[in-house]
Amino acid sequence: MARISGVEIPNEKRVVISLTYIYGIGLSTSQKVLSKLNISEDVRTRDLTEEQIKAISTEISNFKVEGELRREVSLNIKRLMEIGCYRGLRHRKGLPVRGQSSKTNARTVKGPRKTVANKKK
């Protein structure tokens, strides 16, 4: 397995798909990187030469990926929470941030139901 940006990318998959295993690199970014380096998207990762792997690594080092990107995202969320804006309050309460209804759904964000016992008559 080739190691790029601290991530083991799978050998058996096409390079364009293998690069998406790196956090912060999606399909379009991996296509741009490969076209810039004149590497075919259909080549398997195991068939890449050392020079091609190094070229891909140096090209990807220009992007924010993995730990650096995760850190930036978490700092952005912390900043929203500190300034007390609406999005920050929603993050703090563990509710949907982007305007979704939360009366009935939103179970993914809210977590499992906290069941309340019925009043006896």
From Swiss-Prot:
Pfam families linked to this entry: Ribosomal_S13
Keyword rRNA-binding: yes
Entry keywords, A to Z: Ribonucleoprotein, Ribosomal protein, RNA-binding, rRNA-binding, tRNA-binding
Region (Disordered): 94-121
InterPro entries: Rbsml_uS13_C, Ribosomal_uS13, Ribosomal_uS13-like_H2TH, Ribosomal_uS13_bac-type, Ribosomal_uS13_CS
GO molecular function, one term: rRNA binding
Family, per entry: Belongs to the universal ribosomal protein uS13 family.
Record's subunit section: Part of the 30S ribosomal subunit. Forms a loose heterodimer with protein S19. Forms two bridges to the 50S subunit in the 70S ribosome.
PANTHER family: 30S RIBOSOMAL PROTEIN S13/40S RIBOSOMAL PROTEIN S18, SMALL RIBOSOMAL SUBUNIT PROTEIN US13M
Name of the protein in question: Small ribosomal subunit protein uS13
Lineage per the UniProt record: Bacteria, Bacillati, Mycoplasmatota, Mollicutes, Entomoplasmatales
Gene: rpsM
